[in-house]
């Protein structure tokens, strides 16, 4: 499946982390989501109902990030991915949760986890490099 919808750089304040100060003060998280879905019907019909609504995707992802604190960003990414996979039209999803202000003492640009889900292989199935599903 080559068709996909990409949401990049969704920035949301959340309270996720292992340390108490992360869960109290919170910090900025950046979310990237790629949804593999057949877009042929949407292209032919020109109807929002025939595609995956990226406005709703952004809204739900933001709700999850801003929601209850989690110790691990892996959990946050999995919640977003599982929500996307609730839509049976979706073939696969990849969610990257970036934590650019993570409490790492060394200088770094970013740290992220990437969660992938697919109908073909279920949880943890790896989408091949280049995104072909």
From Swiss-Prot:
Pfam families: FolB
Protein name: Dihydroneopterin aldolase
Residue ranges of the region described as Targeting peptide: 119-133
Binding site for substrate: 22, 54, 73-74
Keyword Transmembrane belongs to the record: no
GO molecular function, one term: oxidoreductase activity
Keyword tRNA processing: no
Active site: 99
Catalytic reactions on record: 7,8-dihydroneopterin = 6-hydroxymethyl-7,8-dihydropterin + glycolaldehyde; 7,8-dihydroneopterin = 7,8-dihydromonapterin; 7,8-dihydroneopterin + O2 = 7,8-dihydroxanthopterin + glycolaldehyde + formate + H(+)
Gene name of the encoded protein: folB
Compartments, as annotated in UniProt: Encapsulin nanocompartment
Top-level taxonomic group: Bacteria
UniProt free text on domains: The C-terminus (residues 119-133) targets the protein to the encapsulin nanocompartment.
Transmembrane segments: none
Lineage: Bacteria, Bacillati, Actinomycetota, Actinomycetes, Mycobacteriales
Biological source species: Mycobacterium tuberculosis (strain ATCC 25618 / H37Rv)
Keywords for this protein: Encapsulin nanocompartment, Folate biosynthesis, Isomerase, Lyase, Oxidoreductase
Other notes: Was identified as a high-confidence drug target.
Signal peptide as annotated in the record: none
Gene3D superfamilies attached to this UniProt entry: 3.30.1130.10
Described function: Possible cargo protein of a type 1 encapsulin nanocompartment involved in protection against oxidative stress. Catalyzes the conversion of 7,8-dihydroneopterin to 6-hydroxymethyl-7,8-dihydropterin, 7,8-dihydromonapterin and 7,8-dihydroxanthopterin, respectively, in equal quantities. After longer incubation times the only product is 6-hydroxymethyl-7,8-dihydropterin. Retains aldolase activity when encapsulated with a slight decrease in rate. It is not known if this protein is normally found in the encapsulin nanocompartment.
Subunit structure: Homotetramer in the absence of substrate. Homooctamer in the presence of substrate.
Listed GO biological process terms: folic acid biosynthetic process; tetrahydrofolate biosynthetic process
Gene Ontology cellular-component annotations: cytoplasm; encapsulin nanocompartment
Pathway: Cofactor biosynthesis; tetrahydrofolate biosynthesis; 2-amino-4-hydroxy-6-hydroxymethyl-7,8-dihydropteridine diphosphate from 7,8-dihydroneopterin triphosphate: step 3/4
EC annotation from Swiss-Prot or TrEMBL: 4.1.2.25, 5.1.99.8, 1.13.11.81
Family of this protein: Belongs to the DHNA family.
């Amino acid at each position: 499946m080559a068709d996909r919808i990409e949401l990049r750089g969704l920035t949301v304040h959340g309270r996720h982390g292992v340390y108490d100060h992360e869960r109290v003060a919170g910090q900025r998280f950046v979310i990237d989501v790629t949804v593999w879905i057949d877009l042929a019907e949407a292209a032919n019909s020109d109807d929002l109902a025939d595609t995956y609504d990226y406005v709703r995707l952004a809204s739900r992802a933001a709700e999850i990030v801003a929601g209850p604190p989690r110790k691990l960003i892996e959990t946050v990414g999995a919640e977003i991915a599982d929500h996307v996979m609730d839509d049976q039209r979706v073939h696969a999803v990849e969610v990257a949760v970036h934590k650019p202000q993570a409490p790492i003492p060394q200088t770094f640009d970013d740290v992220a986890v990437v969660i992938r889900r697919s109908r073909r292989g279920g949880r943890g199935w790896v989408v091949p490099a280049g995104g072909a599903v």
